[in-house]
A protein has these predicted regions:
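Ferredoxin-type iron-sulfur electron-transfer modules and their immediate structural context
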Residues: 212, 228-355
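Iron-sulfur cluster-binding electron-transfer modules in prokaryotic oxidoreductases
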Residues: 203-208, 258-269, 371-751, 755-766
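Hydrophobic alpha-helical membrane-insertion segments
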Residues: 75-86, 164-185
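Alpha-helical membrane-embedded segments
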Residues: 13-21, 122-126, 171, 210-247
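Juxtamembrane inter-helical linkers in multi-pass membrane proteins
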Residues: 32-57, 137-158, 192-202, 240-270, ...
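Juxtamembrane/interface segments at transmembrane-helix termini
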Residues: 21-41, 94-98, 128-145, 179-192, ...
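Membrane-interfacial helical/loop segments at transmembrane boundaries in membrane proteins
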Residues: 93-110, 143-154, 182-212
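Iron-sulfur-cluster electron-transfer modules
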Residues: 2-135, 278-287, 309-315, 322-518, ...
Length: 767
């Protein structure tokens, strides 16, 4: 128990520090609420949200997804500090009213043991992480690409200073408490429920124990109180902000962008984000929840290929700017505008246009921050307000506006891909069991047409009653939306929703994950609620029900997970299950499933030249596939997305590798035709007006050196082998009694004319 003078001083000090800390937390709340209202539901199903927040926080499940050793040491600090909320309260009371743990029986002994052991673990955890960050060489060190825009406070090493302050506080706080507990043991004798304190007790004598007890009390509790004033500005605030992020997490899949109200008639329309206050308030909460662990940067395909974008730097820059506003322009908390645009301190325009919207940063973030959504809002402002649009995107926009497709090919040619096949439109077959959403790529791009033709031949073979919209179908607007042109997206989407609501499809199947995501998930925001599947999911059901049977091939096959099929929509098993019956040798890429590496096409990147970097994203991914397939005689890289296929096909030197890049549907058709005796002929699309595809690199070396950025190379450990899939019966519509489909033409497939587009050359780095 404290002497009377110490009690009075402690109460005065506590009152002052709690007042300062409370004011700091209130101002922090005001800064976060300076953001605009969010269009997403954040607090519906509150019981489920609270349960999710508690479970995710207490299990540290998202933290342990990556870096298991670092996460292990971090858990020492987390669990120790969580328990220290109780320890500090009990210790504070003990300074005024003696608390006898022995009188509490088993509960007291358990409490004493946990307080003692966790004190030791916290100290071990802090020392380990300090050594890792500041002394041990690591490719995950806290560093950024030279192209990345960094806040002036980052360049002034304030992040390092903050880390040192927080580490010193934890060491002093917990160390003081441990010494105070050890001094008590030195007087009372060894305790079995306090092994760490007993070990330290040999440093003290009964004569100096009281002074060390007083020091321990003030050192432990005084440091906590003193830290309250700094706490709202430090990185340690994430210990409170992370549970709030879990509580307010979006309840839609990551592929669904937030809705935007298009008020073009307003005097000053607010479309997208120009400044901090234009971001929705959860985006500002992101900045304070950020752990600054750089895991998002580790997996970002733009960062991995030497580009200016770092999702980690984006969040850190936001937080530092918010803290600067708190110190120098407090009016921001009361509605005053911030002085600087986001592109002046958060990220550069080059970085804003480098994002592929692959969602890897969202998947890996321990606190569920969403830097991708910041970038989308910045693009919205740049496109719809500032008019700053990459030239090549303007060409794609014009195509979508005039011809309903980004290639700009005449809309009347939308059904030309189906020449010679038994494909009926909804005008001819108004109530099909399946509506095949063809998409722009399969309608106009020769490579993607092979997928569409293979898929409809499989549907015919299985006797599925299907139809397409034909010329009633237009671009979903996915690329326009991810490029920031929400207005164009709504024009296209509204037209499609009106068409689909009139058709009333029972089931929509798409071969393009981007179309699947837009029609199945994003159209719900504008009145379009449909059941949509990826073609691999539907084909898996046809195989499982016995309506399709395939022979097993001899090729060695690996599979590339498309971002919008896998991470954004959670479809991983269906394509793998099909491949496992098509080949006896299916190998996984090192970066697979939710950890898959982007092909580089998403986020409207397909329609523009990549931003400056050390290599193309698709080249990085293709190199990984080449390594996985090794020296096999027959090698196949399977895909489930037309854009992935085109990007990976464009890799320089691919022809020398003899790697065939095929959609899963193409491979399944080969197996089905082989089993039925039709040979391995796959009917390709007829000659048509060619669509410009992706750039073909002509001068890059075959083995470009990856940027020295964390996790540019695949992990050394291979993914575990998965059990071979055995088809099970699935409930599918029975074949209709419609007239037998016309036989598939057996004419030899014409070779697709070469795709021509200007070569890509890395731009000079501007320092």
């Amino acid at each position: 128990m404290l002497p009377l003078t110490h009690k009075i001083l402690f109460l005065l000090f506590a009152a002052i520090m709690i007042a300062l800390g409370g004011r700091g937390f209130y101002r922090l709340y005001r800064r976060i609420r300076a953001g605009r209202e969010d269009t997403d539901q954040r607090f519906n199903n509150l019981k489920k949200r609270i349960a999710y927040s508690l479970i995710t926080t207490l299990t540290q499940s998202r933290t342990f997804r990556k870096r298991p050793v670092v996460s292990f040491f971090h858990s020492f600090i987390f669990y120790g500090f969580t328990f220290y909320l109780l320890v500090n309260l009990v210790d504070a009371i003990d300074g005024f009213i003696p608390v006898s743990l022995d009188s509490l029986g088993l509960a007291g002994r358990v409490y004493a043991f946990l307080a003692d052991i966790l004190s030791a673990l916290v100290l071990v955890g802090v020392v380990a992480l300090v050594l890792r960050r500041f002394l041990l060489p690591s490719r995950r060190d806290f560093r950024f690409n030279v192209r990345t825009l960094l806040h002036e406070d980052v360049r002034a090493n304030k992040i390092t200073l903050d880390s040192l302050i927080v580490s010193a506080f934890i060491l002093f706080h917990v160390g003081s408490r441990a010494m105070g507990a050890a001094a008590l043991v030195a007087v009372q004798g060894p305790r079995g429920d306090a092994p760490f304190a007993t070990l330290l007790s040999h440093l003290f004598t009964p004569q100096n124990a009281f002074a060390w007890r007083i020091f321990g009390y003030w050192g432990a509790l005084g440091s906590v109180l003193a830290f309250l004033a700094y706490f709202p500005y430090s990185k340690h605030i994430h210990i409170f902000m992370a549970p709030l992020k879990y509580l307010a997490a979006r309840d839609v899949t990551s592929g669904v962008l937030p809705a935007l109200t298009l008020d073009m008639e307003a005097d000053t329309p607010k479309l997208g984000a120009d400044k901090l206050e234009d971001l929705a308030w959860p985006r500002l909460l992101d900045a304070y929840a950020c752990i600054q662990c750089n895991r998002c940067q580790d997996v970002c395909p733009a960062t991995a290929t030497g580009k200016a974008l770092s999702p980690s730097a984006l969040e850190i820059n936001k937080r530092l700017e918010l803290n600067e506003l708190a110190l120098h322009q407090p009016g921001f908390e009361n509605g005053a505008p911030s002085p600087s645009p986001l592109l002046a301190f958060a990220l550069s325009p080059e970085a804003a246009w480098a994002c592929t919207t692959c969602g890897a940063c969202l998947e890996v973030c321990p606190v569920q921050d969403e830097p991708m959504l910041d970038i989308i809002d910045i693009r919205r402002h740049q496109v719809m307000i500032a008019g700053e649009i990459p030239t090549q995107l303007q060409t794609a926009f014009r195509g979508m506006e005039r011809t309903k497709n980004p290639w700009g090919i005449n809309h009347d040619k939308r059904l030309d891909w189906a020449a010679g096949l038994n494909v009926r439109t909804t005008d001819e077959n108004p109530e099909p069991d399946v509506l095949f959403w063809v998409g722009c790529a399969a309608s106009y791009d020769p490579q993607s047409q092979k997928t569409a033709r293979a898929f409809v031949q499989l549907l015919d073979h299985a006797g599925v009653d299907f139809a397409v919209l034909g010329k009633r179908e237009c671009c979903t607007g996915d690329s326009a939306r991810r490029a920031g042109n929400e207005y164009l997206y709504r024009q296209l989407a509204d037209q499609n929703v009106a068409t689909l609501n009139a058709v009333k499809p029972k089931l929509i199947v798409a071969t393009c994950p981007h179309c699947m995501n837009a029609v199945g998930k994003e159209y719900k925001q504008i009145g379009g609620d449909y059941k949509v599947m990826h073609h691999t999911e539907y084909l898996e059901q046809l195989v499982a029900s016995g309506r399709l049977a395939s022979d097993t091939g001899s090729a060695t096959v690996t599979y590339h997970d498309p971002c919008y099929l896998g991470r954004h929509n959670g479809v991983y098993d269906a394509p793998r299950n099909l491949l496992n019956i098509l080949s006896n040798t299916v190998v996984e890429l090192d970066r697979n499933r939710e950890n898959s590496f982007c092909c580089g096409a998403g986020g409207a990147q397909f329609w523009k030249e990549e931003e400056p970097g050390t290599e193309r994203i698709s080249d990085n991914r293709y190199r990984e596939a080449r390594q996985a397939l090794g020296n096999a005689d027959e090698k196949v890289l399977a895909v489930g997305c037309p854009f992935c296929k085109s990007m990976l096909e464009s890799t320089p030197g691919k022809g020398a590798d003899a790697i065939a890049i095929k959609d899963v549907a193409e491979l399944l058709l080969e197996g089905v035709q082989k089993r039925s005796g039709a040979g391995q002929h796959v009917d390709a699309a007829p000659p048509a007006e060619l669509a410009p595809a992706i750039p073909i690199v002509q001068s890059l070396p075959a083995e470009p050196v990856p940027a020295s950025i964390p996790e540019t190379a695949p992990p050394t450990e291979r993914a575990p082998e998965r059990k071979k899939w055995t088809p099970k019966a699935a409930a599918l519509p029975k074949p209709t009694e419609a007239p037998s489909p016309a036989p598939t033409p057996e004419t030899p497939q014409p070779e697709a004319a070469p795709v021509v587009r200007k070569a890509w050359n890395p731009k000079a780095n501007k320092n």
